């Protein structure tokens, strides 16, 4: 699928299978989400640009590669996005963080925005937007709309699961934003849930209904 990368690393797929199981506990689900987010972050950042820096090791002075440019921004779509955020910050602790409050109205399936906080200079940074589920795509589309209104243009979207319907909607709205996911599932049901999916990621992560 054009513009979509499926991260099929064996460890990612193994952990995802355990997360899908309905008997997986809240604590285990949360831990696995943190672990899998680190692996996903590794893949979504593999082409970051490097520059050479002169450093001193205990033995000699050398030229060594280091990330070039301003720090990344991880933009979490609340609340479930925070589950991915933690593992990514373990890997890139210097990243800046944006929080975007968008929830899906369960009657209309449309996004409702309630919060937005991001660094002022998002136009100068790579933004990685995170949300475990790309279902209808409406929430992620709305979140990226807000970032673009602030001048952001170098954006990537990272999720755990995606539905074909959500991918189509997302790519139609933001064809310039690549999507990274661990799996593309079959379809959405009448309630807008990904099938076979893993249920509501936020509820499973926080033990709510």
Curated annotation (Swiss-Prot):
Top EC category: transferase
Entry keyword set: Allosteric enzyme, Glycosyltransferase, GTP-binding, Magnesium, Nucleotide-binding, Transferase
Obligatory cofactor(s): Mg(2+)
GO biological process entries: UMP salvage; uracil salvage
Catalytic reaction list: UMP + diphosphate = 5-phospho-alpha-D-ribose 1-diphosphate + uracil
Organism whose genome encodes this protein: Rhizobium etli (strain CIAT 652)
Cofactor note: Binds 1 Mg(2+) ion per subunit. The magnesium is bound as Mg-PRPP.
Gene name as annotated: upp
Name of the protein described by the UniProt record: Uracil phosphoribosyltransferase
Known regulation of activity: Allosterically activated by GTP.
CDD domains per the UniProt record, alphabetical: PRTases_typeI (cd06223)
Binding site for uracil: 194, 199-201
Biological pathway: Pyrimidine metabolism; UMP biosynthesis via salvage pathway; UMP from uracil: step 1/1
A GO term, aspect molecular function: GTP binding
Stored InterPro entries: PRibTrfase_dom, PRTase-like, Upp_B, UPRTase/APRTase, Ura_phspho_trans
Superkingdom of source: Bacteria
EC number assigned by the record: 2.4.2.9
């Amino acid at each position: 699928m054009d513009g979509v990368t499926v991260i099929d690393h064996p460890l990612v797929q193994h952990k995802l299978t355990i997360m899908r199981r309905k008997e997986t506990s809240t604590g285990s689900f949360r831990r696995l989400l943190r672990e899998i987010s680190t692996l996903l972050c590794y893949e979504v950042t593999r082409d970051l640009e490097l520059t050479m820096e002169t450093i001193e090791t205990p033995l000699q002075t050398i030229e060594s590669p280091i990330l070039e440019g301003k720090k990344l921004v991880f933009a979490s779509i609340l609340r479930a996005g925070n589950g991915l955020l933690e593992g990514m910050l373990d890997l890139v602790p210097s990243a800046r963080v944006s929080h975007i409050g968008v929830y899906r109205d369960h009657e209309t399936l449309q996004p409702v925005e309630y919060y937005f906080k991001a660094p002022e200079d998002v136009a100068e940074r790579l933004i990685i937007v995170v949300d475990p589920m790309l279902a209808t795509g409406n929430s992620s589309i709305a979140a990226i709309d807000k970032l673009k209104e602030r001048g952001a243009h170098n954006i990537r979207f990272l999720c755990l699961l995606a539905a074909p319907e959500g991918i189509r909607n997302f790519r139609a709205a933001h064809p310039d934003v690549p999507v990274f996911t661990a799996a593309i599932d079959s379809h959405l049901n009448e309630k807008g849930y990904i099938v076979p999916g893993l249920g509501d990621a936020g509820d499973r992560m926080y033990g709510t209904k």
